[in-house]
């Protein structure tokens, strides 16, 4: 997959996720609220995105060519400004 096709595919996935789950800012806020309870410390929506990127990077260390994980890293990074 080329750089441009990866970006185009990621944009499509983000649109599909928005259709399936709604506004990313609301979803990341809801996740942050749940993680804050679970972890006993305040978590921000940006931290959720960064943690999800880190999870995907850990998986990519095992399989650097896994396309879904690459797309997810790009997608979470793209959402960082939106979910702040």
Role assignments for model-derived ranges:
Residues 1-84:
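Intrinsically disordered, low-complexity regulatory regions
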């Amino acid at each position: 997959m080329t750089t441009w096709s990866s970006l185009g595919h990621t944009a499509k996935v983000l649109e599909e996720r928005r259709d399936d789950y709604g506004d990313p800012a609301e979803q990341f806020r809801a996740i942050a609220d749940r993680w804050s309870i679970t972890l006993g410390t305040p978590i921000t929506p940006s931290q959720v995105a960064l943690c999800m990127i880190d999870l995907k990077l850990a998986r990519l260390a095992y399989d650097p060519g896994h396309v879904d994980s690459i797309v997810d890293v790009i997608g979470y990074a793209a959402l960082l400004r939106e979910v702040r």
